Amino acid sequence: MKSASTAALFTSLAFLAFATPALAATADDCEGHESQTKLTVQVTGVRAARGEMAITLYPDDASRFLAPHSKLARVRAVAQAPVTTACFWLPAPGFYAVAVYHDENGNRDFDRTMVGLPAEGFAFSNDPPTPTALPPFRAVRFSAGEGETRIRVKLRYLK
């Protein structure tokens, strides 16, 4: 009996020894080079802890917003319901934009329905309305100051 308890204790300690560093690393492990300006993005309304959350950061340039190969950085975080959080080190204080999608099937594509509507959850900084089209850049642009800026976005699922 004593050896079974001892084995269980050592198994638990071994798990904690290996799991704790991994958990600790994700808490403050921000994308980018450490700077004086940090952005924390809290994605709410996550309906399932499956797949990953693609959180993309764009510079203050309307022509680069949602354009291919125009992002400043992207975090692909394991989706956690009901909230997934990620952070970025920003190059400097200024204006930025964020776009998010919930890649539930993990194929690294923003899937659409047969008629072109989003098949996966999505969100933008400032949570602008998106009834029939993508929001204009001016609606998603936000200011990040020196130190830490926190924003919250709410996922929308159309299906």
Residue ranges and their predicted role:
Residues 54-58, 99:
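Beta-strand signatures of extracellular beta-sandwich domains
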Residues 25-31, 121-158:
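Extracellular beta-sheet/turn segments enriched in Thr/Pro/Gly and aliphatic residues
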Residues 8-21:
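Bacterial N-terminal signal peptides
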